[in-house]
Every structure is written in structure tokens, then in C-alpha cells.
């Protein structure tokens, strides 16, 4: 499943296609969204926000389209008038004079008012997004030490969107390798230096992955600057200590680590 950096880049592509342009046609597959087609035609997409793995498409009339791709949903950008060759089921079409964005296969789609944005169940549960430039290491450290999270093992905590939105499995293993910790640790047991290192890595690594335009694939690379240190590298030598990277399962997900330098 895509993680925060991949979802933010997808949102960037959608924004580049239609942001600031009047919508010439709007279509929704679900009956409960049909009344909004006429309300949105002629409006402008002002921005597309990511909240973890959810996208919020904000319109100039104050409405917001909430969508969560879950496992199968995917957005596409096409030239207006193009007919895509796909077997996927179309859910949303937002069309401008020159570009159209399409959402396929997703089922978690809603239209929200400004008030509903503050009470939506998923948006209430999800933590601050690691790609939100306003989020600081000091705030992350405070969350780590909060009563809600301080006694949670990192193996599960770093997959929990309520802690920090946008993290996922490859980020989990890369962050823990960066700070030299195993997944069994808890924030309450770390010393000050470890807490500070982890608080920075929880933001630095997702942001580096995003800015270097990498993607999680078998090439193990995230652009020119971000390269997987342990993810999908079991059996290889750790570049930090020379130990052999191992693979196990933690919190029902594959976990890669170096037993020689992660303690």
C-alpha cells in the first residue's frame, strides 16, 4: 500500500492538472453524491490536501471531497476527451477544459462541509501528517511521550495512523534503522538522545523520500538521495556495520533490520 510520500506526490500530480481551473463537468458514480455534480460544475479546486492515506479535494464553494483509496483505489490524470483503456470501475470524474482527473475502484468517498470536516470519524482519529511542514520534532517528541503512546512498542506504533499519519511499513523499518533501534522498544524507555534522534527521523525520512521523488519498488531506491538501507535487503550487508540484514515479522508486517547495530 502506498505510504505518505507516494500519496502526497499523487496529490501533487492531481493539483498540477486541475488546480485553479473551472470545472466544466463533474460526475459521481454513487447516488448520494449525484446532487453535488451541478453544485461543483463551474467551481474551482483550490487545493488537494493529504491526511495520511486520505485525500481532501477542496472546492471554491467550501465543499470538500473526502476519498480514501484503501487497497484498490487509484487516481489518474488524462487529457480531457481521452477515453482510458481500463477494466477498473470509475467512481469520480472532475473535468476541466484541458485536463481531467479520475478516481477508480475506491468506495470510501464522501462530500463534506467545513463543519463536517471537523467531525469526520477518520479525520478525527488520524494524527498529524509527517509531511505537514508545520509539524516539528518537538511536537513529535511530545506525542511519543504522551500517555496515549509512550507505552506502545514501535513495531506497532509506527504503523498506527493515529500516532502520525503517512507512516507505513517501509518508513517504519528505515526510521528504526536510522536511529539504531529495534521494534520492541517503547518511548518511555529511551534516553534523551534517543528520543531526539527518533523525533527527527520520524519527520526527516518521510520528507526526504517525498522530496527526492522516490517510490517503493523492487529497485530499493528513492530517487538520487533516498536509498533503502534495510527494506527488501535481507541477506545483504548493512552499510553501517557490515552485519547481515535479516527479515522477520512484526505487527503482522515484514520487518527488516540489522541485528548487529540495531539494539
UniProtKB/Swiss-Prot annotation:
Q: Which CDD domains match?
A: EcNei-like_N
Which Gene Ontology molecular function entries are recorded, alphabetically?
class I DNA-(apurinic or apyrimidinic site) endonuclease activity; damaged DNA binding; oxidized pyrimidine nucleobase lesion DNA N-glycosylase activity; zinc ion binding
Q: How is the cofactor bound?
A: Binds 1 zinc ion per subunit.
| Active site (UniProt) | 2-3, 53, 253
| Cofactor annotation | Zn(2+)
Question: Which Pfam family, an example, fits this chain?
Answer: H2TH
Q: Which UniProt keywords apply?
A: DNA damage, DNA repair, DNA-binding, Glycosidase, Hydrolase, Lyase, Metal-binding, Multifunctional enzyme, Zinc, Zinc-finger
Q: Where does DNA bind?
A: 70, 125, 169
Its Enzyme Commission number? 3.2.2.-, 4.2.99.18
Q: What does this protein do?
A: Involved in base excision repair of DNA damaged by oxidation or by mutagenic agents. Acts as a DNA glycosylase that recognizes and removes damaged bases. Has a preference for oxidized pyrimidines, such as thymine glycol, 5,6-dihydrouracil and 5,6-dihydrothymine. Has AP (apurinic/apyrimidinic) lyase activity and introduces nicks in the DNA strand. Cleaves the DNA backbone by beta-delta elimination to generate a single-strand break at the site of the removed base with both 3'- and 5'-phosphates.
Family membership: Belongs to the FPG family.
- Please give the name of this protein: Endonuclease 8
